[in-house]
């Protein structure tokens, strides 16, 4: 087993470019990470045979493929850099394929009025902060279902919550700082429904380390009968991602309501949906180039692609730029300055790589000279040959000279006049290889700036290598 994984790692390193050669010590550490990960979360040794003695190399490859498919990675059966990166991220301790099931079938609570008890408290936070985090986590689920939760201070509750470390006698020991943050058991008698948090982590109520409210909301989903979701935007996604806004996605809501039924509220709650890159109806809020790559923005997500790696990276905007808001409305790159600008409302942010530049956000009226009637920018693009930036606002476009730092006279003009054929509204635009690509709804127009002609008309998501659009 060890030698097989080492061989797979060597093959990955041989075939990769731009990465330093891994040392034998690093390779051994990576082998150990892969072994432990597949054992803990993908049931690699479910037959009782120790991992180190397994001789069925096909099983290892299949488990790697299973993990890669779950996380939306390129399915190779090899522990490549992307796979290892996901394996090294902090996450929930509940397996992705072998659930903590105490009863057969799909466990659920028969009673919808449940009790919970916090057995002990972490010293990282005040008792009030812990109580509030747990209460809010339960409230997320009660808001979208018929479930109610009552805190008790003594005796046995349906859901017992505790902070423990290492081996805490439930056959699922914690692993110290990082890695496995917490776990919870599905509904059932005894330990069923209980949630355990690793005391070796540092629990917080903000962005630092691990936000207790965020982790508790996930774990209590397991306590209610939910398994992990492959939807990166779902609260039940296994890896820890904290964006500052803890909310249930539509996937989470659909899951809990499939078990317990809809909320008793007269207006049924709904949650944000994660973009499906190959959805033919996909639209974009903003698009920009970034150091040779393309960045597409939708709600709280970005989609990242380039010509060298066909897989689309989908993640939260806040993971890449914590200081940049969700719901961006426009973006453009000035490549020779290595600078990208993001717009929302009357503010804009300038970034270099993953860093927001000092002094931002700034006001669009003061920086660019827009009149007060312009409340926001719909789309923007920097035209490299002329050094001009085009801003699209409703049916008009403005032209800004980046080097003179002033608006050009004669603008605004009607979009249909300046860029004939693309319509009178632009959702997003970028320049690549000398052409402009305009987006409106599900349509994309390739535009030749020199001849003022449309060259092609395609689906908006044609950059994502989808088989069908």
Curated annotation (Swiss-Prot):
Q: Which Gene3D superfamilies match?
A: Collagenase (Catalytic Domain) (3.40.390.10), Hemopexin-like domain (2.110.10.10)
* Motif Cysteine switch: chain residues: 90-97
Mostly located where? secreted
* Binding positions for Ca(2+) 2 per the UniProt entry: 158, 190, 192, 194
Q: Which residues form the propeptide?
A: 20-99
Q: Which residues form the active site?
A: 219
Extent of the signal sequence = 1-19
Q: How is its activity regulated?
A: Can be activated without removal of the activation peptide.
Q: Which CDD domains match?
A: HX (cd00094), ZnMc_MMP (cd04278)
- Detail the disulphide connectivity of this chain as listed in its UniProt entry: 278-466
UniProt binding sites for Ca(2+) 1: 124, 199
Positions with a binding annotation for Ca(2+) 4: 285, 329, 378, 427
Instruction: Locate the site labelled Cleavage.
Output: 258-259
Its UniProt entry gives the catalysed reaction(s) as: Cleavage of the triple helix of collagen at about three-quarters of the length of the molecule from the N-terminus, at 775-Gly-|-Ile-776 in the alpha1(I) chain. Cleaves synthetic substrates and alpha-macroglobulins at bonds where P1' is a hydrophobic residue
Can the keyword Protease be found in this entry's annotation?
yes
> Binding of Ca(2+) 3: at which residues?
175-176, 178, 180, 198, 201
Family matches, as SMART domains:
HX (SM00120), ZnMc (SM00235)
At what positions is Phosphothreonine found?
274
Annotated PROSITE patterns:
CYSTEINE_SWITCH, HEMOPEXIN, HEMOPEXIN_2, ZINC_PROTEASE
Q: Which GO terms describe its cellular component?
A: extracellular matrix; extracellular region
Q: Where in the cell is it found?
A: Secreted, Extracellular space, Extracellular matrix
Q: Which residues bind Zn(2+) 2?
A: 92, 218, 222, 228
Return the similarity comment: Belongs to the peptidase M10A family.
Protein name per its UniProtKB record: Interstitial collagenase
């Amino acid at each position: 087993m060890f030698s097989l994984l080492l061989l797979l790692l060597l093959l990955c390193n041989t075939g990769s470019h731009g990465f330093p050669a891994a040392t034998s010590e690093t390779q051994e550490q990576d082998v150990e990470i892969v072994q432990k990960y597949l054992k803990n979360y993908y049931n690699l040794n479910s037959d009782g045979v120790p991992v180190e003695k397994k001789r069925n190399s096909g099983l290892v490859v299949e488990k790697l493929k299973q993990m890669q498919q779950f996380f939306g990675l390129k399915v190779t059966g090899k522990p490549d850099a992307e796979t290892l990166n996901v394996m090294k991220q902090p996450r929930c301790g509940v397996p992705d394929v072998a659930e903590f099931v105490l009863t057969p079938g799909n466990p659920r609570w028969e009673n919808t009025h449940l009790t919970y008890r916090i057995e002990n408290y972490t010293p990282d936070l005040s008792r009030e902060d812990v109580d509030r985090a747990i209460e809010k986590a339960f409230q997320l689920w009660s808001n979208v279902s018929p479930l109610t939760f009552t805190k008790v201070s003594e005796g046995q509750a349906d859901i017992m919550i505790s902070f423990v470390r290492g081996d805490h006698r439930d056959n699922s020991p914690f692993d110290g700082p990082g890695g496995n943050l917490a776990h919870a058991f599905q509904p059932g008698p005894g330990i069923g429904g209980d949630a355990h948090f690793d005391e070796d982590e540092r629990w917080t109520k903000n962005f630092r380390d691990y936000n207790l409210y965020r982790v508790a909301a996930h774990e209590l989903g397991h306590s209610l009968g939910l398994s992990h979701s492959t939807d990166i935007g779902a609260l039940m996604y296994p890896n820890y991602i904290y964006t500052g806004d803890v909310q249930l996605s539509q996937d989470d809501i659909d899951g809990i309501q499939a078990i317990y039924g809809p909320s008793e509220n007269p207006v049924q709650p709904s949650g944000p949906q994660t973009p499906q890159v190959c959805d033919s109806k996909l639209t974009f809020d903003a698009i920009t180039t970034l150091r040779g790559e393309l960045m597409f923005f939708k709600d709280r997500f970005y989609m990242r692609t380039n010509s060298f790696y066909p897989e689309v990276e989908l993640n939260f905007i806040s993971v890449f730029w914590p200081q940049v808001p969700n719901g961006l409305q426009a973006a453009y790159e000035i490549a020779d300055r290595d600078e990208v600008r993001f717009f929302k409302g009357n503010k804009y942010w300038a970034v270099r790589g993953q860093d927001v530049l000092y002094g931002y956000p700034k006001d669009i009226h003061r920086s660019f000279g827009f009149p007060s009637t312009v409340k926001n920018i719909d789309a923007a693009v920097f035209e490299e040959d002329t050094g001009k930036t085009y801003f699209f606002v409703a049916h008009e476009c403005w032209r800004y000279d980046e080097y003179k730092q002033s608006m050009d006279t004669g603008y605004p003009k009607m979009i249909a006049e300046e860029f004939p054929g693309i319509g009178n509204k632009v959702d997003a635009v970028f320049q690549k290889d000398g052409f402009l690509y305009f987006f409106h709804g599900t349509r994309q127009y390739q535009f030749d700036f020199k001849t003022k002609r449309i060259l092609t008309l395609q689906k908006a998501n044609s950059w994502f290598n989808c088989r069908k659009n």
